[in-house]
Amino acid sequence: MAALQSSFAGLSTSFFGQRFSPPLSLPPLVKSTEGPCLIQAKLKRWERKECKPNSLPVLHKMHVKLGDTVKIISGHDKGKVGEITEIIKHNSKVVVKDVNLKTKHVKSRSEDEPGQIVKIEAPIHSSNVMLYSKEQKVASRVGHKTLDNGKRVRYLIKTGEIIDSAENWKKAVKEKEKTTEAVAAAS
């Protein structure tokens, strides 16, 4: 038994009879960036909630849309107000600008480039956000009504303010295109 233990002890510290040298410890090269977020939190395959028989995810309807101003009603960012920048329909999550920031440690791409610590906006469940009126500074549930011209719109129940307008939607889509072009140009 003693011979077996001594042979295992030799295996753990050597490789074919050669001793390993201790690892060199280099000072960490960490750089914090305060610029625009170029990294997005990707959804892992195992994070899907439900699947259809054809293996596609079930898409859920949500009470918020891209470009809506929302207030966080639960979680560690409770009370913060921000604009929705991305919607993930198959798990009912949204990404709100400057809310739910997570720290991401990014490896260097080449040896001479240092690694980075970057803050990214992680998704938050849509049930934890509520539509917010900038004018009256109040959060409200959403209602649906049909206007005189037959168009269905969303409105805030507390204030009666109509959320859906063509200008807001075009503005949100243009901002989304600008950010994707900036990310594509940077990489």
UniProtKB/Swiss-Prot annotation:
Swiss-Prot/TrEMBL keywords: Chloroplast, Plastid, Ribonucleoprotein, Ribosomal protein, RNA-binding, rRNA-binding, Transit peptide
- Single GO molecular-function term? rRNA binding
Q: Where is the transit peptide?
A: 1-41
Gene3D superfamilies per the UniProt record, alphabetical: 2.30.30.30
- Return the CDD domains for the record: KOW_RPL26
Q: Name one GO cellular component term.
A: ribonucleoprotein complex
Name the GO terms of the biological process aspect. Answer: translation
Q: Does the keyword Ribonucleoprotein apply?
A: yes
InterPro entries hit by this protein? KOW, Rib_uL2_dom2, Ribosomal_uL24, Ribosomal_uL24_CS, Ribosomal_uL24_KOW, Translation_prot_SH3-like_sf
Key word Coiled coil present: no
The compartments listed are:
Plastid, Chloroplast
- Organism domain of life: Eukaryota
Question: One Pfam family for this entry, by name?
Answer: ribosomal_L24
Q: What's this protein's function?
A: One of two assembly initiator proteins, it binds directly to the 5'-end of the 23S rRNA, where it nucleates assembly of the 50S subunit.
**Subunit architecture:** Part of the 50S ribosomal subunit.
Family statement: Belongs to the universal ribosomal protein uL24 family.
The protein, known as? Large ribosomal subunit protein uL24c
